[in-house]
Curated annotation (Swiss-Prot):
It comes from the Eukaryota. Residues 1-24 form the signal peptide. CDD domains: CAP_euk (cd05380). Keywords: Allergen, Amidation, Disulfide bond, Secreted, Signal. This is Venom allergen 5. Transmembrane segments: none annotated. The primary structure of this cryptide Pep-4 is identical to that of cryptide Pep-4 from Tityus obscursus (AC P0DRE9). Contains 9 disulfide bonds. Its main location: secreted. It is found in: Secreted. The modification Arginine amide is found at R82. Belongs to the CRISP family. Venom allergen 5-like subfamily. It comes from Tityus serrulatus (Brazilian scorpion). Expressed by the venom gland.
Length: 416
């Protein structure tokens, strides 16, 4: 009996060690996004993997083939001859983080997409293409990325220009449309080759893309002359030559790590605009009451404010600028909130409070569930000067909760 008890204790210790080891290798943000995040998975030990990973030569092949396809689309020279030119097609770059997660999926030896949240990263949502083939040969075959990318591209012959805008997703063309989604500009890929039986080799190719494409009711690209609709912080064509940047003639080349600026909104008539960027206005000036754990996170193409609270903690972010309009105003807060570890309860209490002298504050309790920023608009039919408070609290004994704020904006007049 004593021997059985000792064996049981050893197994418990081993289990705890393995769990703690996995957690230590799984970044906190990935554990927030999904309890099944692909990066946090280990290799499939039942799979007889013989080769894995993507060489530098294969990286170059992947990037070059994607950009050739995108450039042909942008110039109106695609092989199908049916698609119009694109004015905002970005040039693709390699992304190591996307590649690491793609490799982890390939290591599972299963020809199946992972879930959207399972591959999410902080910078953006992530799209995905996969391809597999089985080869009979005595010698271990080399990876041949040309076949995978050609297979995805050939879906163009089932795609028509009617679906460019508004875009409608279709499983028959989803690989192609992700390849040429104009706002996607980062790609990272993974590869494995494993032996199913003697002299039978299965190759699995995975590419992850960011920002993700295939968004229904959006647009595949802006139909226009090449380079005409490039976002800020990019160059294209002859403009790239002036910047001494090599680029494809029809592709918008991102100039630096800040990424392209997709926001085309004119904020000149707004009475309050805080997006937490370094060049943002004085509207972002604030002070903190309660737990001062707020951080400003710089990511590609964006910035956001974030806080993580434990059970029993609370915080108030008080903005010092007044909002006032004789016609009232429409206040929009873009946020996301939830448990800091996926799968635990979403119990954080988030309030947007508007204060004015001599009156009871207006209070709006907001909630969300998911990893996407949610813009929430509130019509305020008052012409008094008002101050914004962002209040967040977590009940005692509850698991840690997070709140992210992307922007806070107000324009004159009530919301549409």
């Amino acid at each position: 009996m004593k021997g059985i008890l000792l064996l049981f204790l050893k197994l418990v210790v081993l289990f705890v060690y393995l769990c703690s080891s996995v957690l230590s290798e799984c970044p906190a943000l990935y554990r927030r996004y999904s309890k099944e995040h692909t990066f946090c998975k280990t290799k499939n030990q039942k799979c007889n993997i013989k080769r894995w990973g993507v060489s530098q030569d294969d990286r170059n092949t992947i990037i070059n083939l994607h950009n050739k396809v995108r450039n042909n689309i942008a110039l109106g020279q695609d092989q199908s001859g049916r698609l119009p030119a694109a004015g905002d097609m970005l040039e693709m770059e390699w992304d190591d983080e996307l590649a690491q997660i793609a490799q982890k999926l390939a290591d599972q030896c299963v020809f199946k997409h992972d879930c959207d949240d399972c591959r999410k990263v902080e910078n953006f949502d992530v799209g995905q293409n996969i391809f597999t083939t089985t080869i009979t040969a005595v010698e271990i075959p080399d990876p041949f990325w040309v076949d995978a990318i050609r297979s995805w591209y050939n879906e163009i012959y089932r795609f028509t220009r009617d679906f460019i805008k508004p875009f409608t997703s279709d499983h028959a063309t989803g690989h192609f449309t992700q390849m040429v989604w104009s706002k996607t500009w980062r790609v990272g890929c993974g590869y494995v080759l494993y032996e199913k039986r003697k002299d039978s080799w299965t190759q699995l190719y995975v590419c992850n893309y960011g920002p993700a494409g295939n968004l229904d009711d959006s647009e595949l690209y802006k139909v226009d002359k090449p380079c005409e609709k490039c976002p800020s912080n990019t160059c294209c064509g002859s403009h790239c030559k002036k910047k001494k940047s090599t680029s494809y003639l029809g592709l918008c080349d991102v100039l630096n790590g800040s990424g392209p600026d997709f926001d085309e909104t004119d904020f000149s008539n707004y009475i309050f605009n805080c997006d937490f960027k370094p060049e943002s206005s004085s509207d972002c000036n604030n002070k903190v009451e309660g737990s001062n754990k707020w951080q400003t996170r710089q990511i590609i193409s964006d910035v956001y404010k974030t806080v993580v609270l434990n059970g029993g903690e609370n915080t108030v972010l008080k903005f010092t600028s007044n909002i006032q309009s004789k016609d009232g105003f429409c206040l929009t807060v873009s946020f996301r909130k939830g448990p800091n570890i996926a799968g635990t309860n979403n119990v954080g209490e988030f309030d947007v409070q508007l204060e004015r002298k001599g009156a009871k504050p207006l209070n709006f309790r907001l909630d969300s569930d998911g990893n996407q920023f949610l813009p929430y608009s509130m019509g305020i039919p008052m012409n008094h000067p008002m101050q914004i408070n962002i209040k967040f609290s977590v009940p005692k004994g509850a698991p840690a909760q997070y709140l992210d704020i992307s922007y806070i904006r107000a324009r004159p007049g009530l919301c549409n």
